[in-house]
Every structure is written in structure tokens, then in C-alpha cells.
Amino acid sequence: MKLQLAAVATLAVLTSPAFGRVLPDGKYVKIPFTKKKNGDNGELSKRSNGHEKFVLANEQSFYSVELAIGTPSQNLTVLLDTGSADLWVPGKGNPYCGSVMDCDQYGVFDKTKSSTFKANKSSPFYAAYGDGTYAEGAFGQDKLKYNELDLSGLSFAVANESNSTFGVLGIGLSTLEVTYSGKVAIMDKRSYEYDNFPLFLKHSGAIDATAYSLFLNDESQSSGSILFGAVDHSKYEGQLYTIPLVNLYKSQGYQHPVAFDVTLQGLGLQTDKRNITLTTTKLPALLDSGTTLTYLPSQAVALLAKSLNASYSKTLGYYEYTCPSSDNKTSVAFDFGGFRINAPLSDFTMQTSVGTCVLAIIPQAGNATAILGDSFLRNAYVVYDLDNYEISLAQAKYGTGKENVEVIKSTVPSAIRAPSYNNTWSNYASATSGGNIFTTVRTFNGTSTATTTRSTTTKKTNSTTTAKSTHKSKRALQRAATNSASSIRSTLGLLLVPSLLILSVFFS
């Protein structure tokens, strides 16, 4: 989920078991999570206008943790999001609750029932996201715990009005905080940063470095983990490579990167018989756990579609092609400048209710930033280094046994700079064919990165109906928001129903 920059497509819930903890001797915080499939959320209601819908339902997911807030404590489930930086929770008395959506599923915070809540009336809160959801309220403080981890003193907002059924625990860079780059900060001409969750962990002594590693695990598995302040070497194979974040908003006065944008240096396709380089045009790409699917500039998607003999369907709004067989080993190769992350084509393929397949990589028009969501991220082990404005990546390794955790002190242990570390994106350009990304791949032993052997069974979508959203989205006036989500929203209908966001294409 990214503030105004990225459309979020979320459906299933990844919940955190009760054994996430701080390890005093190792100084890191481990938050395991489990996956809850979309079918567990119940049936969707019928659209008010009766139109049928084509729904991509199987891959939607988000990560959540349960927090205990106040005295006595009230339990709330919030989205864990790398694409934003603030913690906010739904407040009691939200006008959307009841008649429009069920607010009790993930909990609401009633500040009047907490004897320890302290409001900060001088710090209003407003956040708007690319999917049309928003939250409005004010900051405050209270007793706050995640399992045995005491977070009291961490500032959070209570949203008196929101069209989202759940709150958000943003763990992005502090420059994404609404107090720094949000609507209120801009209008009041007073911007400041505060210790959000990652910074709070560091400054409270729970971790040594403001960094965390993300392991989504294979889609067929029901668990994964996030380590704050550490790396688990058992969760990846080959070399862990480091690349710098790129500052897309330097011209707007930002001295440092605002979000987790990196340089995608090329895109390719690997089959049993050959390697195909699609483009070596440099593209800025956001690594965002709050976005389920992957979004690429329209020219790049067209090149990929052409290599698959896919044709664009105006009816569906997607590229359509013959469904690959269950034993198809084709993978999409993402080049980051001297190393690749490979992802099975099946992760970007969805089967329709009528038996055809579509390419579930969403094209974006104009000068658009690529968004590498969960369909990409589950194939990578990703370390977000907020202190050094860097990302470290390696091919994810599944089915590992014993953990091999190493604390991050100042830099990511065992990671080395990518061969093209300094060859970063600088200007928007249309993706064109040419080049060869397969001659530059390196690993610690000098061989090509191994393509993961994963199931390529195509995900199947459900033909279902859903309620029509009746709310107009509010827009945040962020300085960082040069890329709107309008191109995404013109391709997909993003509809908010109780606790669910559905990606859908309308049939006439």
C-alpha cells in the first residue's frame, strides 16, 4: 500500500501468531505470519447495478499483526505495510461503520474507554492511498503492545473517519510520514518527522539498525516471516546483492529517497529452450509488500505479451493467451544490474472463469514507476535497509530447515554491492527491446543464478459478484505524489467491500 502512488490489491489476510518477539541477546524482532485464504472471508455480496464481474481473487493478500492498545487493552488487527510510514487505527464512531461496512472484523479503538490515552490535538492526521481508501483523525499516544513487546510511546493516529475496515502499521521511510509529506503538512507549511515503528524499535534498543528482512515464502505455503534488525541466511540461495534506492523526487526538494524505489535494469523470459531479453531500458521500480500484483510500464508489458503470443482483450482489459501446461517451467527474469531474480510465469498468470488465461502484470501508461508487489516479492528475499537507503536482494529459498539468523549492526551481513550498483535510473524512457540481461548474471560462485523449481500451476479466478462502492476517494496533496494511480484505476475497478479489496474487470 503506497500513499497515493500505488494501487493496492488485497484480499487474503496474513496474520501473525503470538510468538513474534524481541530476542534480547540477538537484538532483533521476529514477526512470523500465516496466510489466510480469500475463501475464509465469506461470500461477496451482489453488485447493486447487477453487472457481472471478472475477478482476480486467488493471489490477493496482505500482512497483518495484532496490537493491544489502551487501558484496559483493546485488540486491533492492522496491515503491515512497507509503502507507508504511519501507524493508524480505526476509531469508534466512524460514519462508514454499520450501514456500509463491518468495522468489528479487525477491531476499532474506543479512546474514551482507555484511561491512559493522551490526544495530541495539535497533530491532525490525514492519509489517502492509491486504492481510494483514506483515513482522517488525530495523533495521540497510549499503552501499546505487540505480544510481549512494549511499544508505549510510539505515536499513532486514531481515525474518526475512514472507508477502510482495518488500520495500517506503516514501516516505510520516515519521509513518507503524513507529518512530513502529507496534505496537512503541506497546507500548514510545517513538516516534521517522528519516530515511526522501525525508528522506534531502534531508538528503544530493540534493534541495532533500522532495517528488516522480508520472506513471503512460496505461495503454496501458509507461513512467512519478517525480521526487524536481522537477516536469516537460510531463506535465500546464492549471493545477497545490495543496490541503492533511487530518489525520484529530488527535483521537489527531497535530499534522500522517499520510498523503496530501486532500478530495474532489464526484463527477460526464460524457457526450457532459450532465454529472451525483453528490454534493458532502466525503469524505477517500487518494492511494495502492500501491493499484491506487479505493475510495469505499458511498453514493457507489451514486449512480454508479444513474447508469449498474447493479445490484448478489450473485453477483459488484460492480455489473453493460451494457458501454459502445469509442467511449464517458463519464468520471468528481473535484472537488477548484474544479478537476476527469477519468478515463475505462473505467478503472473491467472485463469478466467471461462478457461482462458490472462497476464496478471498490470500495464501503466506514461512515465510510470514499476511496482513489484507480492507476485514478485515472494520469489525474492528482501532486506530493507532504511539507515543506508539500500535494498539487498537474493533468490528466495523455500523449504529450509534450521534458521541461520545474523543481526544487522550497521550494514547487511554477507551482502555485497551489485556489479552495476552505481548504474542507476535517472530519467524516464519508453521501454524498448534489445540488449542481453543473461550475460551479466553473477553469484558468489560465478555461476548463473539458479531458476527456482516451483509449481507452475495456473491460479484460477472465481466468477463472482460484489457490492459497488459508493464513496469518492479523497486525494492527499503529497509532494511525493507525482505518479497518480489513475492509469491503474482505469484498467481495474478497485472496489472496497467489507474488509476486502477486489481487482475486477467489468463485462458489458
From Swiss-Prot:
Which InterPro entries would you find in this protein's record? Answer: Aspartic_peptidase_A1, Aspartic_peptidase_AS, PEPTIDASE_A1, Peptidase_aspartic_dom_sf, SAP-like
GO BP, sorted A to Z: fungal-type cell wall organization; proteolysis
Extent of Low complexity compositional bias: 448-468
Q: Where in the cell is it found?
A: Cell membrane
> Which parts of the sequence belong to the Peptidase A1 domain?
63-394
Task: Reply yes or no: does the keyword Cell membrane apply.
Answer: yes
Which residues carry attached sugars according to the database record? Answer: N75, N120, N160, N163, N275, N309, N328, N367, N422, N445, N462
E.C. number: 3.4.23.-
* Superkingdom, taxonomy of origin: Eukaryota
Top enzyme class: hydrolase
What is this entry's stated membrane topology? Lipid-anchor; GPI-anchor
Region Disordered: start-end pairs: 448-476
Residues annotated as catalytic: D81, D288
Keywords associated with the record? Aspartyl protease, Cell membrane, Cleavage on pair of basic residues, Glycoprotein, GPI-anchor, Hydrolase, Lipoprotein, Membrane, Protease, Signal, Zymogen
Lipid attachment, kind GPI-anchor amidated asparagine: N483
Q: What induces it?
A: Positively regulated in response to cell wall perturbation.
Q: What does this protein do?
A: Cleaves proteins C-terminally to mono- and paired-basic residues. Required for cell wall integrity.
Name of this chain's protein? Aspartic proteinase yapsin-3
